[in-house]
A protein has these predicted regions:
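Periplasmic-side early beta-strands and strand-to-turn transitions of outer-membrane beta-barrels
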Residues: 173, 177-180, 184-187, 191-288
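Outer membrane beta-barrel strand-and-loop segments of large Gram-negative receptors
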Residues: 244-245, 336-342, 386, 478-482, ...
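Gram-negative outer-membrane beta-barrel transporters
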Residues: 357, 396, 507-511, 532-630, ...
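Structural signature of Gram-negative outer-membrane beta-barrels, strongest in the C-terminal barrel
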Residues: 258, 268, 378-511, 571, ...
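N-terminal periplasmic "start-of-domain" segments of outer-membrane beta-barrel proteins
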Residues: 41-70, 98, 106
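Flexible loop and strand-edge segments within Gram-negative outer membrane beta-barrel domains
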Residues: 245-249, 262-309, 315-338, 373-375, ...
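Short acidic/polar hinge/loop motifs at secondary-structure boundaries
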Residues: 117-144
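C-terminal beta-signal and adjacent terminal beta-strands/loops
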Residues: 220, 454, 510-512, 517, ...
Length: 697
């Protein structure tokens, strides 16, 4: 049962005036001076230190904002992005879903909030939710492929940056805001959010608040797949409902900044509370809380040598408690500080063009602890610092990009009665990148990017030694790991004419020592006993009476990831647009030739969008093919076709108010994502209808 803490009540009442103010504005909009609404331009903030247009970037970047983001918004960050070319999701039930980019997840996909890491523990375990709620996000940038040069080794697979504008970066004159409410869907969601920015042209204040609640997810059949039941005899008991999948959460923020003609300086405080069922176990819930303080400043047009400086920093206090039948079993804490300072220089003239670029310093200091019976990692302090340089050289209509990064990471564990003496590990890393954009003509262009990437192993890859209940394994790390190395190439051909566009790209990444968990032939008792005797086969050790789990070790193996991505947008008739997309990933262990686990199959998608006046309608279909290229102890995942439809209508009133309805899984298919660890005991929701209203002012 969800229990409201006193701190949550204080946060709610502190933000309550925002709801009344917003309601008043919606009902009596003539009281306020009508402001000028500024729409966000579809320009990537992430992986774009020089602020060029998205079409000029060498690396593939997807930008979601405005209406497009609003229509894609889901309960989790992973599901909001799932279906973008190259992006799937871990989908650990409806409440915990992290983005997977090109088959890579966890410590190889960096998730940021306003350019700074979120510092939660979602990369440690699939049942840990990302500490960002999509209801408040204003823009999401997705960088597909290595971005370690700018963001460190944890971005070797890509970057997801959620931008919420809680620190206003531009001048605000008057009152701007939005509100949104959603009801229904397969989980019977009741969600609402409100955002307000108030300013006098120099000083701006931001406030936002949201609340969400869901019930058990309605599913189109049994939670347990037929393949799993046939393979190991797991009974197919739960039908029509995904047990222990409800959730309840709330949060909000307040921020302020001084804005100038050439920059800003500001700060914000935000809080997030989330209580949800883990699905994997019927009696386990996670009660999460995250408090975050941000400061940010940026100034441009400064002088003849250094023309721009930017500083961002965030401090996060994160805690979540795993409740077993209402009793706290294990408590996870992560407290940390992360930030960056970046300076841009004025263009340097050369015989072939003017070189523009930036130099930066990044730093991170986090302390993680897990206290309780199910802790499988000791307390760890991780510190990192890095220097990087990124440069661009335009040559006529073409461009060359290059850069380097040098860093050091220390990962030090504490002494513990359960895990033994503390250990210290340090890693020196370097990352290099060389890219180019060749403009064939006004419509066609080619891009390519070469990179060498190095990543320090994470604390759980080094020091894990215990039962990981969420994965059903006893995980064993290796403190002797060296840094993970990879080399990659990414190439794309792009076409654009007016609003029509098409791109197709390919990539190849080779890891010399890819770190991942692999099943061994051993078993472990929950107390760590190796190969305990279980004469009667009941899954309980005869001597200790403890449960038994298969052992999984973190190993470093040579591996290759390669794939294709394609996307097109075309106007095929008056007011009618066609969208096409597809992706494919192939990943293997080069030592054995085996396929790597949880790799998404070939996916092809298409969508139609019709808009005339205030009316908008969409029909979308995504087909995921059968995935039979499986790793050891991994079951085949059946194909599915996910069809959805949406209609929206803007009311003829002064405020920009839009009503919308979205139907999901119209074919009522059993949708199981191969990238999900829970794919055989949890399925996506059944055919459902979601309705909502949103307003901008």
């Amino acid at each position: 049962m969800y229990r409201t803490r006193p701190t949550q009540l204080r946060a709610f009442f502190a933000l309550k005036p925002l709801y009344f103010a917003l309601s008043s504005l919606l009902a009596h909009n003539t009281y306020a001076q009508e402001p000028t609404k500024i729409d966000l331009a579809p320009v990537a903030v992430t992986g774009n230190p020089l602020g060029v247009g998205s079409d000029e970037l060498v690396v593939p970047v997807t930008v979601l904002n405005g209406r497009e983001l609003s229509l894609r918004r889901a309960s989790t960050l992973g599901e909001t992005l799932n279906g973008i070319p190259g992006v799937t999701a871990t989908q650990f039930g409806p409440n915990a879903s992290r983005p997977v980019i090109r088959g890579l997840d966890a410590e190889r996909v960096k998730i940021m909030q306003n350019g700074v890491g979120i510092l939660d523990v979602s990369s440690l375990s699939f049942d840990h939710a990302v500490g960002i709620d999509p209801l408040i996000i204003e823009q999401i940038d997705v960088v597909r492929g290595p971005a370690a040069l700018l963001y460190g080794g944890s971005a070797v697979g890509g970057v997801v940056n959620a931008i919420d504008h809680r620190i206003p970066t531009e001048k605000v004159g008057g009152i701007l805001g939005r509100a949104e409410a959603r009801f229904g869907g397969a989980e019977n969601q009741r969600n609402g959010a409100a955002v307000v920015d108030v300013g006098n042209g120099q000083f701006a204040i931001h406030a936002d608040a949201y609340k969400r609640k869901t019930d058990y997810l309605d599913i189109p059949g049994f939670a347990v797949s037929r393949r799993k039941s046939n393979a190991d005899g797991t009974p197919r008991e739960s039908r029509g409902k995904l047990v222990n999948s409800s959730s309840e959460g709330d949060g909000g923020a307040i921020g302020a900044s001084l804005t100038f003609d050439n920059g800003y300086i500001g700060t914000s405080y935000s809080t997030l509370n989330n209580n949800y069922g883990t699905v994997a176990e019927e009696s386990v819930r996670i009660d999460m809380k995250s408090d975050r303080w941000d400061v940010a400043t940026e100034f441009k047009d400064l002088g003849p040598v250094i023309n721009r400086v930017k500083f961002r920093m965030a401090h996060t206090d994160y805690i979540h408690k795993e409740l077993e039948s209402g009793v706290v079993g294990t408590t996870f804490k992560n407290r940390g500080l992360e930030g960056s300072f970046e300076a841009g220089h004025t263009p340097i003239s050369t015989s072939i063009g003017n070189i523009s670029g930036v130099a930066g310093l990044q730093f991170n200091n986090t302390t993680f602890s897990a206290l309780g019976a199910e802790a499988f990692v000791p307390s760890v302090n991780t510190q990192s610092k890095a220097l990087y340089v990124y440069e661009e050289l335009p040559i006529d209509a073409h461009k060359i990009t290059f850069g380097a990064r040098l860093g050091h990471t220390s990962v030090d564990s504490s002494s513990d009665a359960k895990f033994g003496a503390g250990q210290n590990n340090g890693f020196n890393t370097k990352n290099l990148a060389l890219g180019g954009l060749y403009s064939i003509n006004n419509n066609w262009s080619l891009t390519s990017n070469l990179s060498h990437n190095e990543r320090a192993p994470s604390y759980f890859e080094l020091y894990a030694n215990g039962a990981h209940i969420a994965t059903g394994q006893f995980e064993v790390g290796n403190s002797r790991f060296s840094k993970e190395r990879s080399n990659g190439i990414d190439a794309q051909i792009r076409w654009k004419e007016g609003k029509d566009s098409f791109s197709i790209g390919t990539y190849y990444t080779r890891f010399s020592n890819f770190i991942a968990t692999f099943n061994t032939i051993n078993t472990r008792g929950l107390d760590g006993e190796l190969n305990p005797i279980d004469a009667d086969g009941d899954g309980v050790a005869d001597g200790s009476g403890k449960g038994i789990l298969p052992e999984a070790q973190f190993l470093a193996v040579p591996a290759v990831f390669k794939g294709l991505e394609a996307e097109g947008k075309f106007n095929i008739a008056d007011n009618l647009n066609l969208n096409l997309r597809g992706d494919y990933v192939h990943a293997t262990n080069m030592r054995t030739g085996d396929y790597l686990p949880r790799i998404s199959p070939l996916r092809l998608g298409a969508g139609l969008q019709y808009q005339i006046g205030s009316f908008n309608a969409r029909l979308d279909a995504l087909h995921a093919f059968k995935q039979n290229r499986t790793a050891d102890n991994e079951l085949v995942t059946d194909a599915y076709t996910d069809v959805s439809a949406l209609v929206a209508y803007k009311l003829p009133v002064k405020l920009n108010i839009e009503l919308f309805a979205k139907a999901n899984n119209l074919l009522n298919q059993e949708i199981r994502e191969h990238a999900s660890f829970l794919k055989d005991i949890s399925t996506a929701g059944e055919r459902s209808l979601l309705i909502g209203v949103r307003a901008d002012f």
